[in-house]
């Protein structure tokens, strides 16, 4: 073949060393239409490189192919018949092809899962080639032989064949060709197996399906499947929580935030519901129970209404009968001042407490535990005998089992003795009368017993049920009889209490001590109080940090009938308040807040109401009622309470005593600031002001008064209030004058010539003009003369000239009464 023939671009021959397509195909699947049917034939395109032998055979066949191209239409028809036979043969092999493709699909999936597609592809291709290599080559040989003898047309003929080879517009080039020249037989070498390219995961499905269904039948990658499964797993794990409907306990008042937490709702949702009801509130504000019930019902929750006082229900406990144990009796010693109550306790507990008290009176309550020789114990409570401490005596009788009324043999029954008897009767407590000071001479015990009959206190010797025991605390006479009487009555009462469970009891006294804070003396009545317990006492609450007994020894627990002193409360409670142990500090806080609200409401309800007139008078400074503001600070709460109660009992018709603040502890700067702002007097009872408070008081000129005996305090306050009272103005008659002659003087006016008939008259004194025994004028004496000289006074039996201030209607025969006004100091 010449060079010109080789350079023609449009002439197709088989003379090239490699048969290739002038137009490439992107897809590996094609469709061939026949007369009345469609057939799908897989054509696998591979890059094949043939050796030199194939090239030589193709060059030899080049001439025969060119000569055969001019043979005519017979050769063309022959070639067409061969192709039809090949198509029919492909139809017969469809089933085998489908099974082959399914195997290839499974191989492709295993390739994807093992992530080693190249090795699997090589093994599969090698196995497939071993099985089908020879028949495919033979079929290709037959087709090429017929094709070489058939003239080529310029029509496009596309063929799908199961044979492996390279597709062209005019036929198929076999990977393996066999030389047809018998005389020069050349054995085709095995095709060079090169490393196949990595199959794409979509190749198998492109080979199986139609072009129009390729996208629908495309297989998802394994990673995509894993992601989908993980997503479904996460969806199954993350479940939307179902709304829980609760039963809400609603008090009378509840905060919006607490209300939302109780329902497990968001605060914003609760606020939206409140806005629908026309209520604007934030999380820190409170709403009433009716509004909260509407919101809770709308949100689907059930509501249980409770009273605010129900917070104290947790304090109610019932003891089991089998838990009860015998306890020591609690004995209260009561009586008049200086009748020997504290001395009796000193004798019983062998300590000298009385010597440390000012004025010989007990300033506050004390609790002591005395252990007798036989091991039995008695708890004594000492109460003040002064009349101001009536509340403390009342509390003492309320917490005791037995009352000992001490009566001095040389003094007899006194007012506080009668009061103590009444307190004991009101508390329904057994009474023992101890007639003290029998060691003194000239005493009459029978007289004391007869006086007791007047108050229904009848001794056993007279057929009564009251034990009357003569004793001497100083000489320790008959103290053993007194102890036996106490134990006998206690045994008759069968006193028992449960030492198990949460402790409860009563506050005996409370005070503030520098460096230790609030100290509270308590008497345990049931249960066992332990260090670290959370207690509520009145409006004070806190954790017990330290406990000490009556001897000052630190203890870890206290059983019934044991008095102890604790520290750790938020502030000092009131004496007489009950204390209880609670589980959590929140419970204690809720109870304390409720009690504070109740106390505030009670204080507002009993406060006197001022009229509009009183407010105007007070603003103008002309109010008839004067006020004495006071600030009271004391060492213990009982003393402060007694002082305040005694002061408020003072008559206050014209002077009103107003206690701005009363508390326990030293006088502070805040007390001085309050006193300066309200012009108050600070009263300190057994306390002193600190250095800073003293400096502030001197600077602000605030008066601070210190007292150690309640008598002196009450007397001074009474004197201050008396000094604020308006003085009493009294009219005192001093004389009478008879008018005998009237003189008219131009510059002066009328002068009455008079005669002093009684007493004495003074210049500037008050006069009352009487005519026919009727008072026609009352005024002052302006002029008093005797013989043209001004004098200060004229006595009875003398004549004088008088003139009145701003009055001249004087007649002969009128009578003038002369008097003067005397101011007297008013006393409370």
Swiss-Prot record:
Low complexity bias (residue ranges): 65-74
Source species of the chain: Rickettsia bellii (strain OSU 85-389)
Family stated for the protein in its record: Belongs to the TRAFAC class translation factor GTPase superfamily. Classic translation factor GTPase family. IF-2 subfamily.
Name this polypeptide is given: Translation initiation factor IF-2
GO cellular component: cytoplasm
Source taxon at top rank: Bacteria
Disulfide bridge positions per record: none
Region G4, residue ranges: 436-439
Predominant subcellular localization, coarse grouping: cytoplasm
HAMAP family in the cross-refs: IF_2_B
